[in-house]
Amino acid sequence: MGPKAPTTPTKKAAATKSKPKPNHPTYQVMISTAIAHYKDRTGSSQPAIIKYIEANYNVAPDTFKTQLKLALKRLVAKGTLTMVKASYKLSEEGKKEHQATLGPVAKKPKAKTTATSTETTAAPPATPTKKAAPKKPAAKAASTSTKTAAAKKNSAKVTKAVSKKPAAKKAPSKKVAAKK
């Protein structure tokens, strides 16, 4: 009986060691972000999805491709993805699920931007204290405020430019349809 007792705890210890938590999100999330990133009308190919995931996530290279193939098959069977020729697209359900998963992620960058804005407001007061000339700090303080305003305008322009790009893509497709 003595030898049997030690074998049981070693099995439990081995079982706990064999299940490390992955450092990446689920395959469904990774695949949907890869497809949404490319925004192709015909969908994204499997090699493109693999390339995006390997570049952006820390995945185990030995089992990654087989797990990805199985995940793609599972998502097509589930209805989250649709297969078009050799490409994969997000279905309507998949788009809703993807946006639901990105909801909390979109809130986090907003918090980061507020942190960076507080850092930028903290930086200008530090610069006038270093400068000894009394006339220059007032002029430079005004220039820093204009710089922060310009930075805010630039960020607004960036968001506007992003919103204009999809509209520009839609317009040529409508013209092509009109020519037919």
UniProtKB/Swiss-Prot annotation:
GO BP terms, alphabetized: chromosome condensation; negative regulation of DNA recombination; nucleosome assembly
Listed PROSITE patterns: H15
UniProt xrefs under Pfam families: Linker_histone
Region ranges (Disordered): 1-25, 91-180
Keywords: Calmodulin-binding, Chromosome, DNA-binding, Nucleus, Phosphoprotein
Biased composition (Low complexity): 1-17, 112-131, 139-161
Subcellular localization(s) per the UniProt record: Nucleus; Chromosome
GO molecular function: calmodulin binding; double-stranded DNA binding; nucleosomal DNA binding; structural constituent of chromatin
Keyword match Protease: no
Compositional bias annotation for Basic residues: 162-180
Primary subcellular site in the record, as a coarse category: nucleus
GO cellular component, one term: nucleus
Domain H15: 23-92
Similarity comment: Belongs to the histone H1/H5 family.
Role, per record: Histones H1 are necessary for the condensation of nucleosome chains into higher-order structures.
Record's protein name: Histone H1
Natural source organism: Dictyostelium discoideum (Social amoeba)
Gene: H1
